[in-house]
Each structure stands twice: as structure tokens, then as C-alpha cells.
């Protein structure tokens, strides 16, 4: 069955394979183009450097008109990531546009690591530490980075 969503996902996949953004990879599961796994590496020269985070992306037949559901599979401590791994990011919600492809989604999530929005917290403890106690926030992020190596 060849739908517009599946054709678009194949195009996104080919583009991701031929011109991958730095620190990002992703691919559909073997038997389901609507389910993807991705890896985001922590940006260099940041407290996230060296991290390897796994994510899942679930697309509907309405993609690219509807945003995918994206979750961290790796443990995460970040102001904009819920306990279940869901991500509070405007382009995955009210600012979604069909112009975003998978590379843009993953790049935006990678950027969010270093540039959180503590005013729209999904994790209130992380947001509070980010605003009020950067040293403790950085310590907890370092723990998550180290845990990401074995997850």
C-alpha cells in the first residue's frame, strides 16, 4: 500500500541517509515505515557532549499533515521532557508544519537539549534546577549522559 505518508517517509529516509545532520541518525523499523528509531548525540562543547540518546518516532497515515509522536527511550533529565519520554516542543504540537521533515525534527530536539524552555516545563524539578541551581542541574545532566552510554 503506497500512501502519501509512506512516500514522504521514504523520501525523508533517503534524505537522512544521503545528507545526515551532525549527531543524528534514524531509520524505520524493518517491517513498519510508520515506526522509527533514532539516535541523537549530545552536542559538542555542551554539558550533553558524549551522550547517546535513543528515541522512537511514530507516524500516522496523515503525515506530514500531522506531527509524529516522538519520545525519548533513554532516561532523560530535561525541563521539556516528561517522565514517559514525551517531548514538549512547539514544532511537535501547535507549531507543526508539513515542511518539517525527520531531519528537522531530530535537529530541533538536539537543539532543545542545550536551549531548554523552563517556562513551559514538562519536568518541574529539572526546570527549577535549571533556573535556580545550575550546578545541581549540570550534575544531574552529567549522570544522565553517563547512563546514556549503557542504555
Swiss-Prot record:
Lineage: Eukaryota, Amoebozoa, Evosea, Eumycetozoa, Dictyostelia
E.C. number: 2.3.2.23
Keywords, alphabetical: ATP-binding, Nucleotide-binding, Transferase, Ubl conjugation pathway
Function: Catalyzes the covalent attachment of ubiquitin to other proteins.
Descriptive protein name: Ubiquitin-conjugating enzyme E2 2
Any one biological process term the GO annotation gives: DNA repair
Catalytic residues (UniProt): 88
Annotated Pfam families: UQ_con
Domain UBC core: 4-150
Keyword ATP-binding tagged: yes
Domain of life: Eukaryota
Record PANTHER family: UBIQUITIN-CONJUGATING ENZYME E2
Reactions that this protein is recorded to catalyse: S-ubiquitinyl-[E1 ubiquitin-activating enzyme]-L-cysteine + [E2 ubiquitin-conjugating enzyme]-L-cysteine = [E1 ubiquitin-activating enzyme]-L-cysteine + S-ubiquitinyl-[E2 ubiquitin-conjugating enzyme]-L-cysteine
InterPro entries xrefs: Ub_conjugating_enzyme, UBQ-conjugat_E2_core, UBQ-conjugating_AS, UBQ-conjugating_enzyme/RWD
Statement: the UniProt record of this protein carries the keyword DNA repair: no
PROSITE patterns referenced in this protein's UniProt entry, alphabetically: UBC_1 (PS00183), UBC_2 (PS50127)
Family: Belongs to the ubiquitin-conjugating enzyme family.
Pathway where this protein functions: Protein modification; protein ubiquitination
Gene that specifies this protein: ubc2
UniProt-listed SUPFAM superfamilies: UBC-like
GO cellular component: a single term: HULC complex
GO molecular function, one term: ubiquitin conjugating enzyme activity
